[in-house]
């Protein structure tokens, strides 16, 4: 499955647009609290544990979006966009959303 932020794929022709697809991942309160507790891991102003958790959430959102596209019979998702939003009381959760347009490529 090709995922790209561009609206076309170099060297390939889009045969059909299949629709908008999404994937979401939410990092809950306990995870954020644990990550903040590990602030001692910060080296050079960066927290390896926090970045790893964000990476996992991003990968989950992208994988869910790709699976939604696969169910539509897509070969690729173009115009991929990632959004991050803080949710919950006390901003205790982080939601990562991936969205894009599922497409069928010409053979």
UniProtKB/Swiss-Prot annotation:
Sequence intervals crossing the membrane: none
Domain of life, per lineage: Bacteria
> Gene3D superfamilies per the record?
Hypothetical protein apc22750. Chain B
- Disulfide topology: none
User: Record's InterPro entries?
Assistant: UPF0145_dom_sf, UPF0145_YbjQ-like
Q: Which Pfam families match?
A: YbjQ_1 (PF01906)
The UniProt entry's sequence similarity note says: Belongs to the UPF0145 family.
- Report the HAMAP family cross-referenced here: UPF0145
PANTHER family reported in the protein's UniProt record:
UPF0145 PROTEIN YBJQ (PTHR34068:SF1)
The protein's name in its UniProt record: UPF0145 protein TTHA1256
Q: Which organism does this record belong to?
A: Thermus thermophilus (strain ATCC 27634 / DSM 579 / HB8)
């Amino acid at each position: 499955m090709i995922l790209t932020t561009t609206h076309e794929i170099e060297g390939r022709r889009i045969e059909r647009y299949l629709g908008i697809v999404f994937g979401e991942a939410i990092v809950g309160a306990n995870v954020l609290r644990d990550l903040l507790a590990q602030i001692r891991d910060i080296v050079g102003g960066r927290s390896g544990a926090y970045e790893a958790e964000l990476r996992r959430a991003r990968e989950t959102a992208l994988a869910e979006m790709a699976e939604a596209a696969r169910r539509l019979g897509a070969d690729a998702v173009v115009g991929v966009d990632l959004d991050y939003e803080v949710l919950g009381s006390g901003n205790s959760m982080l939601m990562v959303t991936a969205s894009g347009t599922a497409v069928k490529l010409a053979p």
